[in-house]
Amino acid sequence: MPIGCSCRGIPWGDVVTMDLVVPALYEADVTHVRRSPLDHSFRYRASYWLVDFDRLPQPRGLTRLCGRVRSDDHLDIRSLLSDHGIEATRVLLLTSSRVLGYAFNPISVFWCYDEAGTQRAVVAEVHNTYGDRHAYVLRPEPGGTGTAEKRMYVSPFNRVEGTYRIRACEPAASVSVSVTLERPGEAPFVATLHGTRRPNTTAAMVRSVVRHSGLRNRVLIQWQGVRLWRRGLRVQPR
């Protein structure tokens, strides 16, 4: 089981309660833990929005500068689900908003439900700092965990090899997501996201989103890469 993630088990195909009010704002702790070939970890704060992807909020005034979620920042979720034979009438998206026009989303999560409120899929959309993205379509096991082969270069210090074990707990008053990279005999990398829902007011939104902006977090992540390089970790070819 990935570390630091706990949620109620949702067996595949069970009916879930879909009374969650969106949009919802979460303040989250994000941690990266590297276990091989050397130990290294860091943590940062981030703000996330949970939105209905088919009814994206249209912020006005000041909130347009720091609370906008755009569909073209993400994959064509409807086409992707269709390609996998998945029917979903409601899609909830957990993602970071644009701040002053800039968006940085290392991971966004889609929870996909049918008309009866049955969870049909979870999609993890991963972005790297090189402008690439890849979607991992999961059909979670009981407990909300799914697996997928790693297909995209993310960290310059991790080769494109291994299996992601992804656990995405259905959001409520809190939200929890973990991604564990597994290879035979080891789990060299784990990332976790734990968020708490905050009041959806203009003041709370501006304060939270500006304080934990994507640009700041991108610089922090890249600085951690410099630290790893200085410690002698070898860059893997793309």
Question: Residue spans of the language-model regions?
Answer:
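Mature, function-bearing regions of proteins
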Residues: P2-R238
